[in-house]
């Protein structure tokens, strides 16, 4: 049986929600019976991951800054993706490497979008250094 989390997302996007509601949604999402438990075989809730997701959700809601450090295997990616998607706000995620960017956009983000029934828009943005400059190419071909 697959539960739909779309009503949960509509609640987030259509009106301001209380801290208690936001906390409850995050706890439900990260529970064994929640969106992640249903979407990821063998998913095990981790308290550190839930705590981080709540902190990220609070920072987004309060438009404040947050720095989080956590060890390998803590579940950092899902801990920031879930509140980012649930927020209904524009969020920019900057990665430390192109490999992590590719993993995030092509593996983790589609999984979260599917698990949460997210209906918003996501985009992969790259800097100018990632594209061919036709002017430079033509100059190189002449030389």
Q: Can you describe what each PLM-predicted range is?
A:
Residues 4-7, 13, 17-21:
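Short, positively charged and aromatic/hydrophobic N-terminal segments
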Residues 82-88:
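Alpha-helix C-terminal capping segments
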Residues 61-82:
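Walker A/P-loop
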Residues 22-68:
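Conserved pre-motif I regulatory segment
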Residues 3, 20-39, 90-143:
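A substrate-engagement module of RecA-like helicase motors
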Residues 46-50, 72-78, 94, 102-106, ...:
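Conserved structured core elements
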């Amino acid at each position: 049986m697959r539960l739909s989390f779309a009503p949960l997302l509509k609640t987030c996007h259509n009106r301001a929600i209380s801290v208690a509601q936001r906390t409850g949604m995050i706890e439900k999402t990260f529970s064994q019976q929640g969106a992640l438990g249903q979407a990821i075989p063998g998913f095990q809730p981790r308290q550190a991951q839930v705590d981080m997701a709540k902190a990220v959700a609070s920072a987004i809601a309060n438009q404040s800054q947050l720095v989080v450090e956590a060890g390998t295997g803590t579940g950092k990616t899902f801990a920031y993706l879930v509140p980012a998607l649930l927020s209904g706000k524009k969020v920019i995620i900057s990665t430390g490497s192109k490999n992590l960017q590719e993993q995030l956009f092509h593996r983790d983000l589609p999984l979260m979008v599917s698990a949460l029934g997210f209906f918003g828009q996501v985009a992969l943005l790259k800097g100018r250094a990632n594209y061919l400059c036709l002017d430079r190419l033509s100059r190189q071909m002449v030389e």
